[in-house]
Amino acid sequence: DIMNAASSSPAKRRPLVLVSWNGLDTPWAMIHLDATPEFDWVLFDYSGRAQTQEVKWRDQTAQVLSGATECKGEIYQALGSWLSTSITPQTHLPEYIGLLDDDIVIGVSDLNRVLHLARVEGLDVFSPVLTHDSRYTHRWSLQQPHRLFRDVDWVEVMMPFYKGQVFIAASPFFKDFVSSWGFDKYLFPMIQKAIKFIMFRLLLL
């Protein structure tokens, strides 16, 4: 059940950050590789061209996952399935799990920083904010001056980060969802209430 899924692996390993990739262009094309990542990379090839394997590209070590997808819901499914088979008593659950769209411009140092801030604050679900010249759907996802954190009701699926227990507890509900519609506003808040993790925040870089 949800409670057991959330508590089955209390030990943690490094955070995991998945970045979407079209399988053809330069991996991490929008990511500024300006620091050593304090997390593990997953590259998800949504064209299905690449082989599932561990690679070292651009001096970055990454696990490649691959599958022809239509929408982000299938990426959630694929990551959840891979984690369910790769987590062992020796490897444990990632501390945090992030999923970034391939058009997000951000640096490795930024990702290190948001993970550090989330750890310090004990956040359960969070996201970096968008600059005001970004394309956006929700105005509340934009930067605000002189603020480091901002509580919100839910975090959009564009570049969310989840505590490992939250993601794993939600993963059975990803099944057969092509779209991720409703994951952000409904599924993850429901999961958090069920396992008593209730903190949503935006990190204002």
For each feature predicted by the language model, list its residue ranges.
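Short beta-strand-to-loop acidic/aromatic patch adjacent to the donor-nucleotide binding site
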Residues: H92-V105
